[in-house]
């Protein structure tokens, strides 16, 4: 992939990058970046660092794709070597942001880490497993079009859907489709810690050929008596009915449960566990935010400090609108949880895509789950 260098007459706005979520956990690296920026002014530190190593950057996290391995017909695992400043002490179940330059534009999405946090002295590499979605431009490109050697931008690991250490004695994993990805990191970590003592895993996929990590899961079940795997092929057997989960897992109420998958599965799990008074033992991870029906006609979104404006309809998030116009916005989960994307609303009104709530000027809004409700101005 070709590398675009910043010219000497670039403005400060031209060189802005998304705020890296989790940067405050490792202030030392970011202090070094600031020092490098001062020493190399008026040139950018990256103008020098890139000559030594394309993974070195004073303003962002970077990584190199070492390889791509197909998991199923529509999914693949990316092996990524992170560069300077990446922290390998993430927790199993967390996700990272990945930015890829496609057709002259940086496209960002968040994906669950499927690797286990690196032990001291181990190879410094992480993996994410991506399922190509019909509406997902970047996911399709990552699965089918990205080549080894490609340099990507990274956002630090984050997320609260994590496995503690030590792990609880009784565990239940409920996964469906690509919802297995964060749990795969947990399983690999349990193996590394030698903590697979009593784990039940119920996984659903349309067919056996659609099961991500199918061979590895089968090997885990064969090698570890404490890991019991049940795979349901929904095309032939229908969807798992969690109201009858007691038939498969009689002690499910006593188990700490991690569930990840389509919205329907998670909503049913939430209801079943709540009805049983076991909500405190259920941990959910949602890959997409539930949105209300669009209201209004959208409007023109102006990004004040970037000096750019773009027309956006009522169903397009402020983040998507901004990135489409080339504005680099801070981001994290992209689904309204982590609060990394909040900016000040200077003028106009925006609407929360989840609740329909209208936000007034002078408030801070989440750009990933808010849309224009008429013309508006954001302080970024």
UniProtKB/Swiss-Prot annotation:
GO molecular function annotations of the record: 2 iron, 2 sulfur cluster binding; electron transfer activity; metal ion binding; NADPH binding; oxidoreductase activity
KW Iron (keyword) present: yes
Cofactor note text: Binds 1 [2Fe-2S] cluster.
SUPFAM superfamilies, A to Z: 2Fe-2S ferredoxin-like, Ferredoxin reductase-like, C-terminal NADP-linked domain, Riboflavin synthase domain-like
Cofactor requirements of the protein: [2Fe-2S] cluster; FAD
Residues holding [2Fe-2S] cluster: 333, 338, 341, 368
Protein name: NADPH oxidoreductase
Species for this entry: Mycobacterium tuberculosis (strain ATCC 25618 / H37Rv)
